[in-house]
From Swiss-Prot:
Disulfide bonds: none annotated. Catalyzes the isomerization between 2-isopropylmalate and 3-isopropylmalate, via the formation of 2-isopropylmaleate. Its EC number is 4.2.1.33. Heterodimer of LeuC and LeuD. PANTHER family: 3-ISOPROPYLMALATE DEHYDRATASE SMALL SUBUNIT, 3-ISOPROPYLMALATE DEHYDRATASE SMALL SUBUNIT 2-RELATED-RELATED. Keywords: Amino-acid biosynthesis, Branched-chain amino acid biosynthesis, Leucine biosynthesis, Lyase. The gene is leuD. GO terms for cellular component: 3-isopropylmalate dehydratase complex. It catalyses: (2R,3S)-3-isopropylmalate = (2S)-2-isopropylmalate. This is 3-isopropylmalate dehydratase small subunit. One of its GO terms (biological process) is L-leucine biosynthetic process.
Amino acid sequence: MKPFTQHTGLVCPLDRVNVDTDQIIPKQFLKSIKRTGFGPNLFDEWRYLDAGQPGQDNSKRPINSDFVLNLPRYRGASVLLARDNFGCGSSREHAAWALDEYGFRTVIAPSFADIFFNNSFKNGLLPLVLNKVEVDALFAQCQVTEGYTLTVDLAAQQVITPDGTTYAFQIDTFRKHCLLNGLDDIGLTLQYAEAIRAFEATHRIRQPWLFAPLR
């Protein structure tokens, strides 16, 4: 998992409440359990005018020119600004995978659905909570300022605007450690690889019958 320390990126404002996981990545694209291949179909039903299917050439599909991600001013955005209850609906880790693969490093919102919130941390995507007044202020600035960027400093737990305004945010200490060091569940386990090998060697000596071949 790629570490998250400090990130400065173009902001895309998604001004909708209760964005659910089926809207983030529609169900027909969930047949794969690989973590890749979902970015091109992020918000598929909003980005395109036709019904998307796995394996389609998206370059030949009619786009919804009014959807915010398709507006030229937001191309290349890596900070998603959202509204309340982002990521609600069914539990699908694919939603975090799709956002990450598209290029988003963080989603800023007043609140998140619990399962999406947890899945994001496990996949290197920072779900960042600010209060509604702060999010409203960011929406207002983003919508009137083309090329609006934000800096997210995870170590300092601050969001920094282009004019130097800062917004503090809270994050669990353990989750912060994992993001700063790029540690997913596998990475955390591998930190103890030597201790695990030592235990297995000792365990084999102390209880050899557990490792005897079956007859």
